[in-house]
Amino acid sequence: MDHALGALTARFRDHLGHERRVSPHTLLAYGRDLDELAAFVTERRGRPATKADLDKLTLRSWLGELARRVSPTSLARKLSSVRAFFAWLEREGLASDNPAALLKSPKLRRKLPKFLSADHAAEVVEAPLSAPGAEAERLRDAAMLEMLYGSGLRVSELVGLDLDHLALEREEVRVLGKGRKERLVPIGSKARAALHTYLARRAELRHPRTGLQDERSLFLGRHGTRLGVRRVQTLVQRYGALGAGRGDLHPHALRHTCATHLLEGGADLRAIQELLGHTSLSTTQRYTHVSLDQLLAVYDRAHPMARKPAARRGRS
């Protein structure tokens, strides 16, 4: 008996949400990818798609059509979604093979993380203190930037923090990372001071009409509800422009900056991996390439053997 694809993808999403407990963002991405595949097959077959329709040739045709309009990174993610779906089908005894596993992932150009200099990072983090706006919001923003840069949090981890996740007396915060894995992250002295100052004014962030406030969330918006990822991204861009002339600054760049500066300061790669919550050390090792690039740039500027022959002749 063949199975309707829509019913199977619905069960898979239920599995991801309730058993795997993936983040809402990840759940949405998986669902969107599988819905796109089902729509592609339905249009080609002229009837609702079934699992039997998903052979290697059909999947290759779908990826070929996608390759004309999405980036290699998006293409790789969509293929990963389908592979995960088939892996689940196999575990449930609903499929005997995984045709998606036979397809090659697109080659991705490895991008080095973008980061700020120490001076620019300090200017961005301090920008809220001299910016216009309500003081409670500015103090909140200063605390958030200290956490993003000082503790290297992902923006999703930052907005997910609750008040009871903080343990300022122990100088640490409990963070819920990817795959809902918990880790303890140290909080530096500047971040602790910024948090203390913000918490003293947090009560001012409540709904202007009802006076209601989310009593659980650490970082609140002006209406007293949990601050969202998009709002934090907008705020980081604002302070990036004010502090360092970087209106394109993304919260993840502050995380990259944290890791890069720790590595430059002599921190152990394994310790940085634990701090950032990376599952694989290879992810953390990207920062060694950044530091090596910096070292080469300094070498080219400073070492006499690195100078071009013409430059050396001109000095003789």
Residue ranges of model-derived segments:
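Conserved catalytic core of the tyrosine transesterase superfamily
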Residues: 1-316
